[in-house]
């Protein structure tokens, strides 16, 4: 039997990436649990949680736990706080927040920080994700040029021009109608497929296996043979699969929360 290694920094044993059936638990997962599956594999989160857990236990050892906790002394202890800045790095003593709030702000959730070893936390009770917005953004002219001149273009992207010297209401209404019509045409022609949890799930499952394979020290050859044969996987490159997996691991898990179930 093959030896399954535990990834450095993890306090729990991930599934054996070689065994596709070990990932059957992901079938039918709602978006909130998919996001958790990628967050819990993030080494940064594992490290932050280990620090948080040790700090919390040290505070409890000194000040007690509810209902006998000395809240006044707890909240007067600098160890109960961490500085929150735009880049989430410590810088001075201003804008300090409670360490449980620091964890939630950094990683995108409300509620008490969860041990990455926890399977299937109850969404809304144990884990509540912070709202994620999908905002339009201005593209640099060089990016627009590459998109428009690339072979075949980029059908899922639409670049619109607005005359900012004129009223925007009519222009925005027109832009919405144009985008809706183009989306419908592209879907009908099969050039794009709307991303849903159901549509993306097979690829996400492969991404979880790829992350577990890398953490277990699997060779590129071994992992490629096992993972690139996954039906409905939209890449034939193990490097590309790992790139997708890393994107989900490093913050992309929050974008999952924007997708409809089906």
Where are the regions a protein language model picked out?
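K/R-rich mixed-charge low-complexity regions
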Residues: 1, 184-262
């Amino acid at each position: 039997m093959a030896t399954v290694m535990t990834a450095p920094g993890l306090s729990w044993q991930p599934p054996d990436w070689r065994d596709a059936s070990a990932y059957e638990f992901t079938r039918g997962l709602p978006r909130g649990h998919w996001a958790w599956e990628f967050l819990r594999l993030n080494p940064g989160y594992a490290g932050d949680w280990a620090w948080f857990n040790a700090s919390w236990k040290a505070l409890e050892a000194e000040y007690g736990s509810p209902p006998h906790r000395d809240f006044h002394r707890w909240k007067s202890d600098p160890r109960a706080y961490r500085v929150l800045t735009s880049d989430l790095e410590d810088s001075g003593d201003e804008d300090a927040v409670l360490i449980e709030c620091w964890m939630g702000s950094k990683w995108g959730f409300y509620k008490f920080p969860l041990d990455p070893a926890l399977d299937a936390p109850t969404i809304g009770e144990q884990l509540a994700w912070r709202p994620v917005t999908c905002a339009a953004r201005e593209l640099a002219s060089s990016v627009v040029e590459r998109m428009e001149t690339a072979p075949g273009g980029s059908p899922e992207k639409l670049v619109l021009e607005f005359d900012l010297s004129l009223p925007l209401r009519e222009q925005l209404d027109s832009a919405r109608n144009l985008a809706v019509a183009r989306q419908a045409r592209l879907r009908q022609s099969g050039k794009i497929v709307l991303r849903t949890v159901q549509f993306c799930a097979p690829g996400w499952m492969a991404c979880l296996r790829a992350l577990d394979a890398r953490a277990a020290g699997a060779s590129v050859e071994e992992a490629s043979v096992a993972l690139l044969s996954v039906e409905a996987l939209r890449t034939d490159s193990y490097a590309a699969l790992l790139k997708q997996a890393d994107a989900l691991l490093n913050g992309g898990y929050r974008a999952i929360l924007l997708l409809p179930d089906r």
